Regions:
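Long, hydrophobic/aromatic-enriched structural stretches that serve as scaffold segments
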Residues: 83-153
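Cleavable N-terminal export/targeting peptides
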Residues: 1-33
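Residues that define the transmembrane beta-barrel architecture of outer-membrane proteins
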Residues: 55-61, 88, 116-120, 137, ...
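Transmembrane beta-strand segments that form the barrel wall of outer-membrane beta-barrel proteins
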Residues: 40-49, 75-79, 193-203, 277
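Short loop/turn motifs that connect adjacent beta-strands in outer-membrane beta-barrel proteins
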Residues: 25-38, 69-88, 130-138, 187-195, ...
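N-terminal ordered "arm"
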Residues: 33-77
């Protein structure tokens, strides 16, 4: 028999596409910040095909839309900005994550493996960039479900010729409510070189974590610190880059401490899942590099 293992909840890597389309005015907000009038549609796709495995975090997909009108509600207005003169982007997104065991075809529960889990989240977020201090503050409010309601098993059935039977043992339905805040500060900004540090905290019934990281870029980098670029020269966010073709290499490393992870430990309210991982068997500290 296998020895009892330890389980980690590792933030997933993303492949993101950022097609954008811009307008030409910049309305002012209260508190001397600004709302970007540019709009973006973002596709994030994560799959274990990139790592050559088919277990644990096995698939994730997210659709995001950024528009200035999403800032016209109470929740968005309550999210903090990076400071006086900050440029704010408001958006909504929907995300689904899938987690499977190392043997998805197993017909019995293996207490030494991780549980199957599906996550479905809707999100309102605000990305606030203070260019004068090269500071970016991102805040997210997330609401969703873990369990069969996430439709993870249904989607994987459509995608796989052989359906993983282990979904019958997935973590049961429960409500997820999460807050996430991250801050990134650029410390080196040269013509072809960037270095920044970041810190991230999550609190809620899905993930409760704290982490920090370092990020590096080198190449033909965009001139500004903005997380988004636009080709519309009639907006203040237009960079007027010295090169038509931008390219860069990047590297990053970080450490995360996990206090709670519903995809391993089960939902906070529904404690009837057939398999969960006890707290003492969790690896709390995760170190990542890319």
């Amino acid at each position: 028999p296998r020895k009892a293992g330890r389980f980690i909840a590792q933030p997933e890597d993303s492949l993101a596409l950022y097609p954008g389309f811009g307008q030409m005015i910049l309305p002012a907000e209260p508190a001397e910040t600004f709302t970007s009038i540019n709009s973006y549609f973002i596709i994030d796709f994560d799959n274990d095909i990139f790592t050559g495995k088919d277990y644990y975090f096995t698939n994730g997909a997210q659709l995001s839309l950024i528009r200035p009108s999403f800032g016209n509600n109470l929740i968005a207005r309550l999210l903090p900005s990076a400071g006086k003169g900050a440029m704010n982007h408001y958006g909504i997104s929907i995300r689904q994550n899938m987690y499977t065991s190392t043997n998805p075809e197993q017909t019995e529960i293996d207490v030494n493996d991780r549980p199957f889990a599906g996550i479905l989240l809707a999100e309102l977020f605000k990305i606030s960039t203070l260019h004068s201090r090269e500071l970016c503050l991102t805040n997210r409010v997330q609401v969703g479900f873990i369990g069969e309601t996430s439709l993870a098993a249904f989607i994987q059935r459509l995608a796989h010729h052989l359906f993983p039977v282990g979904w019958q043992f997935q973590i049961h339905d429960d409500l997820l409510v999460n807050l996430e805040s991250s801050i990134e500060k650029q410390v080196i900004s040269e013509r072809n070189l960037r270095l920044s540090f970041s810190a991230t905290g999550r609190l809620g019934t899905y993930l409760t974590t704290a982490g920090a990281g370092i990020h590096f870029k080198a190449g033909r980098i965009p001139l500004s610190f903005s997380p988004f670029a636009t080709i519309n020269s009639k907006t203040v966010e237009y960079e007027g880059n010295r090169h038509k073709l931008l390219w860069w290499v990047f590297g990053e490393a970080g450490e995360t401490y996990t206090f709670y992870n519903a995809s391993l430990q089960g939902g906070l309210f529904n404690r009837n899942s057939p398999l969960v991982i006890e707290r003492r068997r969790l690896t709390r500290i995760v170190i990542q590099a890319a």
